[in-house]
């Protein structure tokens, strides 16, 4: 299933920087797991051990153009001219909210094990 970037923006309550059209199929939180950069949305998560924001440059070079961030890069317009940055207070909360909204679209029982 694909989501338009506009739909993602509305679902997570983000402020969008960038005007490139995008369809999102894959959500990414670990830059080592990148498979389909053209349709990937990267969530720059901050943890005790790392900060996903430091992988934006590498992912951009590898073809990712859509990022959910807690802070936009200072050199955003110069170094990432074809990127879309979705600015939120917490990328983790945005990921959780998107997962919740996606789940709400289906009327399928959830089974926990």
Where are these regions (language model features)?
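Walker A (P-loop) phosphate-binding motif
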Residues: 99-113
